[in-house]
Amino acid sequence: AAGVLHHPVYPDIDGVDDFAGAVFHSARWDHSAPLEGKRIGIIGTGSTAVQITDDLIGKVSHLSLFQRTAQWIFPQENPAFSEQEKQVFRDQPQAMDDLHASLTRLFADTFGRAVIGDKEQMQRVEDTCRANLEDSVRDPELRAKLTPDYQAACKRLIISPGFYEAIQQPNAELVTDPIERVEAGGVRTKDGRLHELDVLVLATGFDGHSFMRPMDLIGRDGVDLKDVWAETTQAHRSISLPGFPNYFMLVGPNSPIGNFSLIDISERQLGYIMQLIELWRGGTVNEISARQDAADRFNASVKDAMGDTVWVTGCQSWYLDKHGNPAMWPFTFDKFCDDMSAPDLDEYELVS
């Protein structure tokens, strides 16, 4: 259960170590760095950068957001539950379960289908994002800078209730000129301007393809996972690896992390894995690992289905591996649920 987004990626920018103020990756936040009333620079415009901007804009004297790529922003509707509604959930737990099920189905049938090729649903997603931008940002010059040149959801779709409002505050600046280098006093862009800063935040994302690495994992006959995954990361049903008995992953390669709720995904994968573990616990088998032919068939089906997905429409993102292959789930939510309902033991090598 090593997760996906936990290996920070640092930008290849000259002079970062020369910066005189506090500089840190957003995932390695320096809580000792004072922020109130300071000049803050944020490099990056992904989900983390958007959240930081929204949170800090009312606390700092100036915020410079350095943007390389504009992002689509989906409006967030997240109303608080009233005390009366919460009491209903306490009195009738099934009501909460029913709400969860209805929201899961709604998301699966809309966004979940949009990303795998449902053109009607994708048009709705993109129309909503575009309307959010046009309704929220009146200045045409700023709106043009914030308009992406790729299809919505090709990169990870950002959901935010307040980013557009934050970036339009008097103490906010969207910087789209490329960064030349970092200096002691701030960030110099290629137009020659020095953006003077007290704190520099590197919201530059994560390596989404390392998974449990650099942890050493040695399989049967001394096979090293680093060698198996040297070119691309693959697994059988995102969970098991041929030649690595009794090793199972949550949210492994090609899990639907860009499609559905990560919590729901993990719970269903865990239920599947526990059925395999029960075979071992009950003494039926000593070793369980995916068959190579089963894994090959699964990964071939994934590759064949990727052509219809939004992730191959031309943008660059961590959804793609170094060869440009999407590491996502190209099927429906229902197929994922069916696949995770029970393991097909014919797909596994079982050693007593």
State what each model feature region is.
Residues I116-V125, Y150-G162:
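Short beta-strand to alpha-helix junction loop
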Residues L5-R138, A172-E173, H195, D224, ...:
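Rossmann-like dinucleotide-binding core of oxidoreductases
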Residues W29-S32, P170-K190:
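A conserved short coil-to-beta-strand element within the FAD-binding core of flavoproteins
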Residues Y10-H25, R188-I239:
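Central helical "cap/lid" subdomain
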Residues I13-D17, S32, I158-Y164, L217-F248, ...:
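FAD-binding beta-loop-beta segment adjacent to the flavin cofactor pocket
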Residues A1-L5, I40-I43, L63, I179, ...:
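Short hydrophobic core segments
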Residues Q121, D264, G271-S352:
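C-terminal active-site-capping segments
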